[in-house]
Structures are given as C-alpha cells and as structure tokens.
C-alpha cells in the first residue's frame, strides 16, 4: 500500500470453526486425545501408561520449546507466516481455548488469502503443522492463556530480522497482511 489516505481499507471476515482432526488435516495434526489415534501400551507399568503418537515432529536443527502467555487481542490478523524446515507445534496448558488461522502450503510467496480458515481449539488438544502451513499466532479467548510453542531456534533468529513490518529468513516468511492485501482480515467470533 502506498499510504494514500483516500484508499478504502476492505474488511474480510473469516468464520471460526471447531478444531477437528478432519477439518485440520490439510494443515497438520491434532496433538492430544482428540487426535483420533488409538494409544498403545508402553510395554512397562502393567498397562498403566498408554502412548499416542499422532505426529512426527520434524526439525533437523536446534529446536526451542518455549512458553507463550497470550492475552486477548483484537480478532484481526496482522501477520501470516510459514516455516520451510520444521513442523511448528502449539500445545495448550491449563485448558483455556484459543483460535488459530491457517492457510494451506503454497508454491508461491503468499498464501491463498481467499482460502484462510480459522479454528477454535477448546484447550485440551494441541496442534502440529505440516511444513509450509501458513498460520497466525494463536488468539486467546481468555487472559493468561499458556501455550507451549515448539519451533527451530533459526526461526527465532529470523523473527528478529524485521524489515518493513515483515520478517524473512531461511526458515521463515512472515508477511504483513494489510500491506500485502489492502484488507483487514477479522475473525467472526
């Protein structure tokens, strides 16, 4: 956008859907009991420990496990990002609900903005994205929503290299949605 004050900013609404394994399949896998994957016995502890392996986390480098404490913010997308080298995961602690916006991986430099989808997680299950899945950081529905975020440290370094409201690197493309589209994308919550 060129900063012309005569431009009318468009508003595009995205309906929020329940996070189900079927609805999320194009973007990744649910982590938790809601994954639909049957647990197996660990082989120890007389059957008292069952293990479920809903996804294989992929990262070939130093990986960061961090805790994000999220506060409610306007239900408008500011950025959309993707990672090229790892499968990022969000794992809630404390059972508080949150919303995540996803876009399918694309070959080009931007997502298909007309196909973005928003999903409400109830706080009992997490999510691990496919490599290249476009997403915005979770929106909390309650104060102090704690979410474990698993991603490569290279991504953290890429995020520090902001340029014009965006960040780019070998494992990251983080785009400013308003600059790219001239529109505000808002969630129908």
PLM regions with names:
Residues 2-118, 156-189:
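Non-catalytic, conserved peripheral segments adjacent to functional cores
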Residues 133-167:
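A short beta-strand-loop micro-motif that forms or neighbors metal/cofactor-
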Residues 88-91, 126-127, 138:
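His/acidic/aromatic-lined binding-pocket segments of jelly-roll/cupin-type domains
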Residues 117, 125, 143-146:
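A short pocket-lining beta-strand/turn micro-motif at the edge of beta-sheets
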Residues 120-134:
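Conserved metal-binding segment of the jelly-roll/cupin
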């Amino acid at each position: 956008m060129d900063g012309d004050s005569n431009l009318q900013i468009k508003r595009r609404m995205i309906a929020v859907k329940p996070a189900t394994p079927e609805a999320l399949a194009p973007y990744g896998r649910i982590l938790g009991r809601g994954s639909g994957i049957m647990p197996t016995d660990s082989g120890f502890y007389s059957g008292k420990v069952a293990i479920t392996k809903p996804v294989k986390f992929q990262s070939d480098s130093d990986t960061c496990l961090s805790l994000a404490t999220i506060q409610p913010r306007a239900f408008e997308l500011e950025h959309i990002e993707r990672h090229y080298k790892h499968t990022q995961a969000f794992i809630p602690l404390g059972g508080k609900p949150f919303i995540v916006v996803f876009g399918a991986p694309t070959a080009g430099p931007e997502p298909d903005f007309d196909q973005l989808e928003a999903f409400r997680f109830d706080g009992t299950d997490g999510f691990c994205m496919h490599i290249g899945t476009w997403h915005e950081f979770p929106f909390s529905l309650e104060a102090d929503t704690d979410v474990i975020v698993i991603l490569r440290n290279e991504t953290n370094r890429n995020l520090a290299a902001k340029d014009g409201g965006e960040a780019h690197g070998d494992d990251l493309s983080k785009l400013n949605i308003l600059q790219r589209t001239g529109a505000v994308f808002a969630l129908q919550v």
